[in-house]
């Protein structure tokens, strides 16, 4: 599935392999003096074209992302960096993408535009030709006292004007309206997205993180995820992730890197 390059202090890598009863035979190890230098070295290898993706190991997320977003020698592009979960929930008939639950704390309108664009790109990569994007809030009407509803409406107009392409976008939608056709019908909501969403865009990180974890721990969902918007996909694993989730995230990175590139 992947050809790993292990980056960090060799002694720590070998100790971890011994604990996991894993062989390092044939694997490239790029040694660094300290663990915190591993992210910087990994970013440098990407910039030299030697790596196609990054995967967080035992480093803290902020150590990895600090090296990625550094203006002088990081991996930033014209896009805002964001995280997308791909969730397989038993009660939903298809894969569900949830964003952003890990990177952007309180994204503004411009950031949300890129968050939507990144999620559409990943949906395309996993075979959803024209994803249905639900912009979530607490209610399905535009309310002046709820800023996320105003931003949701603005994102829909951006899609109408060609500022976001590749998907059908509707919002604001409450969570039930986004995933349940019955709930959408009860509220009189008629759209191609309502009740049949492929992508759920949370109003902020707190809402997105809670939603994703509820689906995992209460609904028995399986997850994978990627950070997008950088030069290469970043597999940002959590300490709570099991082996299946980590492998699925590697598969996502492969699919994303192999996707057809469309100028937009």
Locations of regions flagged by a protein language model:
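Anion-binding alpha/beta catalytic cores of soluble intermediary-metabolism enzymes, centered on
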Residues: 1-193, 198-264
């Amino acid at each position: 599935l992947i050809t790993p390059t292990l980056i960090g202090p060799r002694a720590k890598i070998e100790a971890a392999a011994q604990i996991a009863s894993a062989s390092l035979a044939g694997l490239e190890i790029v040694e660094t003096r300290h663990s915190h230098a591993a992210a910087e070295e990994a970013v440098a290898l990407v910039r030299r074209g030697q790596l196609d993706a990054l995967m967080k190991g035992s480093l803290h997320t902020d150590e990895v992302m600090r090296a990625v977003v550094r203006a002088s020698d990081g991996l930033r592009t014209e896009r805002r960096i964001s995280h997308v979960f791909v969730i397989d929930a038993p009660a939903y008939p298809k894969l569900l993408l949830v964003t952003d639950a890990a990177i952007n704390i309180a994204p503004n309108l411009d950031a949300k535009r890129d968050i939507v664009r990144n999620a559409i790109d990943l949906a395309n990569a996993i075979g959803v030709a024209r994803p249905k994007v639900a912009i979530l809030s607490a209610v399905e009407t535009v309310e002046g006292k709820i800023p996320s509803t105003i931003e949701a409406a603005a994102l829909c107009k951006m899609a109408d004007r060609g500022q976001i392409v590749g998907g059908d976008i509707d919002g604001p939608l409450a969570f039930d309206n986004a995933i349940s056709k019955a709930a959408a019908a009860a509220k009189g909501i008629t759209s191609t997205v309502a009740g049949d969403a492929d992508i759920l865009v949370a109003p902020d990180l707190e809402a997105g993180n809670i939603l994703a974890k509820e689906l995992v721990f209460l609904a028995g969902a399986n997850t994978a995820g990627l950070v997008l918007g950088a030069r290469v996909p970043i597999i940002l694993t959590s300490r709570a992730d099991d082996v299946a989730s980590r492998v699925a995230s590697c598969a996502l990175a492969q699919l994303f890197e192999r996707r057809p590139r469309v100028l937009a």
